[in-house]
């Protein structure tokens, strides 16, 4: 699917992980993309920052905490959350441990082999079905399904989803071994944000077979390991809150895990 682009810059942040900045006059839009080859020792890890469901932290702080014992090369904010206490609204699984239960909405989940899936889970007799993921971060709705824009982009109950706003999304490429993490800046004169349908069109243009919308608006944040600063974690996008980066409920990190002998 064609997508209008005026300028693209790219840099490698780790073996198999590239950071792209895409500019389009159509919005206008500034879009950040992390393209992750899951066959190059790169794994996705959900990050909470505490051992309980509650708590709000900046995405940079969550990834920096993980970076004390893992080689974090990038990541984005995760699920929608309860403003009062920071608890994610959907399933959160960190290193195999369920911190919040499923709510019937879809999640981005990774099985024991690190294979990504976008689907809804149920809880039956204390067991997650259809399988117990190693990592899972919630979102809503599914925006691309089987290489087509999903009808949910026009039916999701929140009116803001049908308006242009900052966005965070995750996509799985055809074949299932490449992951796309995407942020779209918005609420600025030079950056309009996207509707979910526009976001779905971009995820398709990237090559996503399936994609899910994550928490957006002021929560939208992408972090990457800057190769020009010895891998220091930096914010790639422009968070839209006046105070800068928002505290969020959870995040999704990309870790370069070659040589790792144990789980985080």
List PLM regions with ranges:
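Short, glycine-/Ser/Thr-/acidic-enriched flexible segments
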Residues: 26-29, 39-41, 81, 115, ...
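Short, conserved active-site entrance elements at the starts or edges of catalytic domains
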Residues: 133-158
């Amino acid at each position: 699917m064609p997508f209008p682009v005026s300028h693209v810059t790219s840099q490698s942040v780790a073996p198999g992980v590239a950071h792209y900045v895409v500019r389009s006059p159509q919005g206008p839009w500034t879009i950040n993309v992390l393209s992750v080859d899951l066959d190059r020792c790169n794994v996705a890890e959900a990050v909470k920052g505490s051992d309980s469901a509650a708590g709000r932290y900046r995405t940079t702080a969550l990834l920096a905490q993980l970076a004390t014992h893992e080689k974090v090369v990038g990541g984005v904010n995760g699920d929608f959350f309860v403003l009062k206490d920071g608890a994610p609204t959907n399933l959160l699984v960190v290193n195999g441990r369920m911190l919040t239960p499923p709510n019937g909405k879809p999640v981005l989940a990774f099985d024991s082999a690190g294979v990504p899936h976008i689907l809804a889970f149920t809880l039956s007799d204390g067991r997650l079905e259809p399988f117990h993921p190693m990592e899972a971060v919630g979102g809503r709705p599914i925006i691309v399904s089987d290489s087509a824009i999903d009808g949910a982009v026009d039916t999701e109950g929140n009116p803001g989803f049908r308006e242009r706003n900052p966005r965070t999304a995750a996509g799985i490429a055809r074949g299932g071994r490449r992951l796309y993490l995407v942020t779209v800046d918005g609420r600025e004169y030079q950056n309009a944000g996207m509707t979910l349908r526009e976001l779905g069109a971009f995820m398709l243009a990237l090559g996503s077979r399936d994609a899910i919308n994550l928490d957006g608006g002021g929560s939208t944040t992408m972090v990457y390991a800057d190769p020009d600063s010895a891998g220091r974690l930096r914010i790639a996008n422009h968070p839209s809150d006046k105070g800068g980066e928002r505290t969020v409920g959870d995040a999704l990190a990309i870790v370069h895990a070659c040589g790792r002998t144990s789980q985080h």
